[in-house]
């Protein structure tokens, strides 16, 4: 792989991370789990800062812009949730959501570790 392909792949993964953390923060806000939401907001901002540093590094060292690949991450929020309000959420839904979201996040972080 060329340096351009490597940087592009990493940046694409970072964009996906930003979207994942944003969706998780929204989901946890919906579930009334503010601490989890704040954590994922923070992770989203950290991911964004890292991506900006990567872009800056690539531009200052290689004097090129990073070509943006098209990607579509898997949705975090289940489609069925859009017909409910946060008042409809019960303890069982929160428990299952925390378990599912944490598993997805851990898997994504494992993919990130493998990629880097």
Task: Cite the ranges covered by each PLM segment.
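Membrane-interacting alpha-helical segments
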Residues: 1-5
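Acidic/histidine-rich alpha-helical segments that form the ligand environment
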Residues: 6-13, 17, 21-24, 76-116
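Generic detector of leucine side chains in alpha-helical contexts
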Residues: 19, 31-33, 52-54, 65, ...
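Inter-helical turn/loop segments and adjacent helix faces that build the functional surface
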Residues: 26-36
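Conserved alpha-helical segments that form or flank metal/cofactor-binding pockets of metalloenzymes
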Residues: 34-81
């Amino acid at each position: 792989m060329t340096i351009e392909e490597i940087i592009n792949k990493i940046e694409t993964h970072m964009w996906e991370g930003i979207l994942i953390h944003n969706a998780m923060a929204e989901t946890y806000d919906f579930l009334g789990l503010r601490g989890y939401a704040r954590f994922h907001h923070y992770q989203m901002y950290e991911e964004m800062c890292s991506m900006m540093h990567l872009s800056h590094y690539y531009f200052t060292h290689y004097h090129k812009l990073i070509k943006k690949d098209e990607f579509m991450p898997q949705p975090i929020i289940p489609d069925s949730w859009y017909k409910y309000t946060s008042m409809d959420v019960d303890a069982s839904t929160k428990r299952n959501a925390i378990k599912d979201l944490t598993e997805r996040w851990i898997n994504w972080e494992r993919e990130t570790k493998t990629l880097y």
